[in-house]
Regions:
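The feature captures the beta-strand-to-loop junction immediately N-terminal to the Walker
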Residues: 35-37
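Helix-to-loop junction immediately C-terminal to a conserved catalytic motif
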Residues: 50
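Conserved ABC transporter NBD signature motif
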Residues: 58-65, 78
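Conserved ABC ATPase "signature" region
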Residues: 100, 112-141, 186-189, 237
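Catalytic Walker B motif of ABC-type/P-loop ATPase nucleotide-binding domains
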Residues: 167-171
Length: 237
């Protein structure tokens, strides 16, 4: 059984069709790439899966449970975490405090509800993740004082705090330098080797080809292709 299954997902904004009957499945431990031009529906699909938007039609199943239209809070607690194109941090809080505060019902700009993890276990997990990401030495720094690449790492770490079964990354490499891209790719691959499941939106085709085992292509709200990196490279769209 697929870990995440999307069936005929459709989203309309007034007369505009942002998604049209898109179906795909994600297997446990998979690293799936989602590509397509701007406006192809990639982020809209993420938003419908994670409860930020309600789909106009279609269904989303997670571990066999229909989660279509459930709130972002419920989806998050079921085990699906995500990052946004716009980094979601609390700038006047320390790096460690950012890790200990989970945003529920993210809208893309705001945390509409907050849940702070307390206790030694939560702190230990936060510190272990910061160590893994290479920013443990910044634990007491304000998030606003971090470089953009460091903020990307912190945002990624916050998504990992809930021990999610699926992590959806929206343009994780956007705006970062080549060294940080290699760093992020290495972290994603290591976590995937540990059993974490990823769905990644990414415009950097070199990254997608090296990172993902399977790629789905969207265009104008429709799924138009699927294959391995080699198959997609052989049949450019």
């Amino acid at each position: 059984m697929a870990l995440l299954e999307i069936r005929d997902l459709t989203k309309h904004f007034f007369r505009l069709s942002a998604l049209s009957r898109v179906s795909l499945s994600v297997e446990p431990g998979e690293l799936l790439g989602l590509i397509g031009p701007n406006g192809s529906g990639k982020t809209t699909l993420f938003n419908c899966v994670t409860g930020v938007l309600h789909p106009s039609a279609g269904q989303v199943f997670f571990r066999g449970e229909d989660i279509t239209g459930r709130s972002a809070d419920v989806v998050y607690r079921r085990g699906i975490a995500r990052t946004f194109q716009l980094i979601q941090l609390f700038p006047e809080m320390t790096v460690l405090d950012n890790m200990l505060v989970s945003g529920q019902e993210k809208t893309g700009r705001l945390f509409s509800r907050l849940l702070r993890r307390e206790g030694a276990e939560a702190t230990a997990r936060a510190l272990a993740l910061l160590e893994f990401l290479g920013i443990a030495g910044l634990r007491d720094n304000l998030a606003s004082n971090l470089s953009y690449g460091q903020q990307k790492l912190l945002d990624f770490g916050m998504a990992l705090m809930s021990e999610p079964q699926v992590i959806m990354l929206d343009e994780p490499m956007a705006g970062v330098n080549p060294t940080m891209i290699k760093n992020l790719v290495a972290h994603i691959l290591e976590l995937n080797a540990r059993g974490y499941t990823f769905v990644v939106i990414e415009h950097n085709m070199e990254v997608v080809m090296s990172l993902c085992r399977r790629i789905v292509v969207l265009s104008q709200g429709e799924r138009i292709a699927e294959g391995t990196p080699a198959e997609i490279a052989e049949n450019p769209l």
